[in-house]
């Protein structure tokens, strides 16, 4: 913030400030737990590894832990992540259904210029061969 002549604002962590708040705020005080809390990941990938160290490392190796930027952060950190915030990450949903502006009409040529040239050459010259 020194760029804007703002000083003495303390340590700023822009990534942490943009992160989603996963805990719900309550006014009641909870009693102190007597045991350690269970190890459950905050990003929702618990069902993949189920607290198994070997399953977790296998999931990391096979890239099974699906965490998209819009699941972790409230707003995109970079311009490259901006597109993933629009994208639906449901496995059964196609992007064309959620964002109709992606779809473009296709005008295919059944007979291209090269195909027409070949057909014309074959009809006019019996000895014509491409090779």
Swiss-Prot record:
Pfam families given in the database record: SPMIP11 (PF22593)
Protein origin, superkingdom: Eukaryota
Keyword Transmembrane part of the UniProt annotation: no
Ranges of compositional bias, category Basic and acidic residues: 21-33
Subcellular location(s) of the protein: Cytoplasm, Cytoskeleton, Flagellum axoneme
GO-annotated cellular components: axonemal A tubule inner sheath; sperm flagellum
Chief place where the protein resides: cytoplasm
Keywords: Cell projection, Cilium, Cytoplasm, Cytoskeleton, Flagellum
Region (Disordered): 18-44
Keyword set includes Hydrolase: no
GO annotation terms (biological process): flagellated sperm motility
Function text: Microtubule inner protein (MIP) part of the dynein-decorated doublet microtubules (DMTs) in flagellum axoneme. May serve to reinforce and thus stabilize the microtubule structure in the sperm flagella.
Assembly information from the UniProt record: Microtubule inner protein component of sperm flagellar doublet microtubules.
Protein name: Sperm microtubule inner protein 11
Naturally occurring in which organism (per UniProt): Homo sapiens
């Amino acid at each position: 913030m020194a760029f804007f002549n703002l000083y003495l604002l303390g340590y700023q962590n822009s990534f942490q400030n943009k992160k989603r708040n996963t805990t719900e705020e309550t006014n009641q005080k909870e009693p102190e737990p007597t045991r350690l809390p269970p190890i459950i990941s905050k990003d929702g990938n618990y069902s993949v590894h189920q607290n198994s160290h070997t399953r977790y490392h296998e999931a990391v190796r096979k890239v099974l832990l699906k965490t998209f930027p819009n699941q972790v952060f409230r707003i995109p950190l970079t311009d490259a992540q901006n597109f993933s915030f629009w994208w639906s990450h449901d496995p059964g949903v196609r992007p064309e259904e959620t964002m109709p502006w992606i779809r473009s009409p296709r005008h295919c040529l059944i007979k291209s210029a090269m195909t027409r040239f070949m057909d014309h050459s074959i009809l006019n010259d019996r000895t014509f061969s491409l090779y």
